[in-house]
């Protein structure tokens, strides 16, 4: 499995998880609206990559569902854990780090489709600042739509700083 950037811990298992039309995308009750918006991004990515339009709901997950869980008791504010097994998918982290777990899951989804390999991923950034520097002094100033697309790509690779030099 190729995940960029490479996580601190990635363990592949022999089992797999199969997405289906009966799968729900569940956001745990204690999650904020910010996390719920991130879950919508995951819902769109699942539909784009598999064709399944999963129901997004709050509450408790059933066996076989995808659960996004808020957890404060983590070693680092940007730490997350992703577990994929036959029982379902669990993405755990802080409000700040759940987006990183979602982005990792999307990378797995893009490589595997609806039949996801069993994985255990634990990750946190190695550096506090991970950024992209865009120098537009000798060319055209980028449009806002381009900058938004660039920000989406930065989120995909877990970058947290953007410097635009005009």
Tell me the role of every PLM-derived stretch.
Residues 1-130:
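Contiguous, structured surface segment used for ligand recognition
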Residues 80-82, 142-150:
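Short, polar loop/linker segments at the starts of domains and inter-domain junctions
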Residues 92, 130-144:
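The substrate-binding groove and active-site-proximal loops of carbohydrate-active enzymes
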Residues 97, 124, 138-142, 146:
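Short, well-structured alpha-helical patches and their helix-loop capping segments
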Residues 28, 135, 165:
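Conserved residues at the C-terminal ends of beta-strands
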Residues 105-108, 112, 135, 153, ...:
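Mid-sequence acidic-hydrophobic segments that form the walls
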């Amino acid at each position: 499995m190729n995940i960029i950037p490479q996580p601190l811990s990635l363990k592949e298992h022999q089992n797999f998880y199969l997405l289906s039309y009966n799968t729900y995308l569940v956001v745990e009750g204690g999650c904020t609206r910010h996390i719920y918006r991130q879950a919508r991004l995951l819902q769109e990515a699942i539909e784009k990559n598999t064709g399944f339009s999963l129901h997004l709901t709050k509450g408790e997950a059933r066996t076989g569902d995808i659960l996004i869980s808020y957890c404060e008791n983590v070693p680092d504010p940007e730490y997350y854990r992703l577990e994929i097994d036959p029982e379902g998918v669990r993405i755990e982290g802080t409000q700040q780090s759940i987006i990183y777990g979602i982005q990792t899951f999307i990378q797995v989804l893009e490589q595997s489709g609806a039949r996801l390999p069993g994985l255990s991923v634990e990750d946190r950034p190695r550096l506090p600042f991970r950024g992209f520097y865009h120098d537009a002094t000798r060319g055209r100033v980028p449009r806002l739509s381009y900058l938004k697309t660039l920000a989406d790509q930065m989120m995909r690779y877990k970058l947290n700083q953007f410097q635009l030099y005009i």
